Design a protein with these regions (language model features):
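Membrane-interface loops
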Residues: 34-35, 81-154
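Alpha-helical transmembrane segments of integral membrane proteins
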Residues: 9-12, 86-94, 156-163, 188
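Short helix-capping/hinge motifs at transmembrane helix termini and TM-loop junctions
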Residues: 27-31, 64, 82-83, 109-110, ...
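N-terminal transmembrane-helix/juxtamembrane module of multi-pass inner/ER membrane proteins
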Residues: 1-67, 107-109, 113-121
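Hydrophobic, aromatic-rich transmembrane alpha-helices
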Residues: 69-80, 144
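Alpha-helical transmembrane segments of multipass membrane proteins
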Residues: 17-21, 98-102, 170-171, 196-201
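Membrane-embedded catalytic cores of phosphoryl/pyrophosphoryl-handling enzymes
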Residues: 118-220
């Protein structure tokens, strides 16, 4: 797979990382974002129905870090079987590394999850940034980037990008609907996922450039 150049990737990383920091600071400082979080969650909670709840639970499963990790590992093994070592390493490193980063950030921020008198679901783990939003952004974003770089027809690449955006938005909405995250949690998860993707592709460029230079020196 051909990688993006480091310039655009580093710009995207800077913007996404900056947005993540702004959201984290807004949460910590108790800005009006906290009121938006509470109002949005309450508005959805009182309008929840069994049918929509079941649908959102299914959507949430498709964006779960555990689900996407299993898919990524299986995909990496398939790529290795097809002798696509670079693609296998990229897929596994980006997805597993993103999950580890999210785990670290959750324990650094230690934000509690939304609280309702009659919760649909409840979890004892930390809330910010959303692991589902991050994992979906990383996994489906990686597939979209692969399509952009490798699709033979442009419309196919655009369809892949639109599908990735739709999945990330739907998974993020499901987490707020189910009462497991604030809006700012999923916003932070998406920003984290974009920043991590951009960082990985910038790093991949420099690693491959170093390997090319080493190979050229060995041949000279």
């Amino acid at each position: 797979m051909r990688e993006l150049g480091p310039g655009p990737a580093l710009i995207v990383f800077s913007l996404a990382a900056g947005l993540f920091l702004v959201i984290a600071l807004a949460i910590g400082l108790g800005t009006p974002l906290a009121a938006l979080d509470a109002n949005a969650g309450t508005w959805l909670h009182v309008r929840a129905t069994p049918l929509v709840t079941n649908a959102m639970a299914a959507v949430s499963f498709l964006g779960a870090p555990t689900t996407l990790t299993i898919v990524a590992v299986a995909g990496s093994l398939l790529l290795l079987y097809r002798r696509m070592q670079s693609e296998a390493a990229t897929l596994s490193t980006v997805v597993l590394g993103g999950n580890f980063l999210n785990f670290c950030l959750k324990h650094l921020v230690q934000r509690g999850r939304p609280v309702f008198d009659d919760p649909i679901f409840s979890l004892p783990t930390y809330s910010f940034p959303s692991g589902h939003a991050m994992a979906s952004t990383v996994f489906y974003g990686l597939l979209a980037i692969y399509a952009l770089v490798n699709a033979r027809q442009r419309y196919a690449a655009y369809v892949a990008v639109a599908a990735a955006v739709f999945m990330v938005a739907l998974v993020s909405f499901s987490r707020v609907y189910l009462g497991l995250h604030y809006v700012s949690d999923v916003m932070g998860g998406i920003a984290e996922g974009i920043a991590w993707l951009a960082f990985c592709f910038a790093a991949l460029h420099y690693i491959r450039r170093g390997e090319s230079s080493t190979g050229a020196d060995a041949d000279s």
